[in-house]
């Protein structure tokens, strides 16, 4: 699932949580995202920024849900996941026994992993974190590195009803 499709399927509540986090904790990313969306629509960024959050956040979610916004949506998801959800990323990588930095970054992912191991790691996350947040993370993780494809992760995402968006 591409990043723009994740925004199409996530709840407005989670989208608002993401945008609020970026607005308060990752201001440069938030400003760049707004400017990118504004440029796509031939608008000035201030036009978007001046909308009250109750109007701005649904508008942003719809805009990130457009195919043309996929790279912007990917950047926003990565910033939110690495900023607000480092521990979840680290827990997933630990469960898979993958070496990573303190912030959850990985130098090299294995070519493939057994389905049982991925399913157990996903179940561990689902037991500890909000279901929709885990689903967004795993769908985004699957799409982040096009050089590494884990068919077992695809199967887990397709079979586990809690991971559907």
Predicted feature locations:
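Charge-rich, intrinsically disordered N-terminal extensions
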Residues: 151, 155-159
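Short terminal alpha-helical segments
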Residues: 1-32, 97
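Acidic, low-complexity, intrinsically disordered interaction modules
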Residues: 24-151
């Amino acid at each position: 699932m591409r990043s723009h499709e994740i925004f199409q399927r996530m709840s407005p509540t989670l989208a608002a949580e993401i945008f609020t986090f970026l607005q308060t904790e990752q201001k440069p990313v938030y400003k760049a995202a707004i400017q990118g969306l504004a440029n796509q629509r031939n608008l000035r960024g201030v036009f978007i920024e001046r909308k009250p959050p109750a109007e701005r956040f649904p508008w942003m979610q719809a805009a990130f849900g457009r195919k043309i916004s996929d790279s912007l949506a990917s950047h926003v998801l990565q910033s939110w996941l690495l900023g607000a959800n480092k521990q979840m990323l680290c827990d997933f990588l630990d469960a898979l026994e993958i070496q990573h930095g303190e912030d959850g970054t990985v130098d090299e992912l294995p070519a493939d992993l057994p389905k049982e191991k991925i399913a157990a790691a996903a179940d561990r996350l689902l037991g500890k974190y909000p279901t929709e947040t885990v689903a967004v993370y795993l769908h985004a993780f699957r799409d982040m590195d096009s050089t590494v494809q884990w068919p077992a992760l695809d199967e887990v995402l397709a079979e586990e009803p809690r991971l559907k968006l």
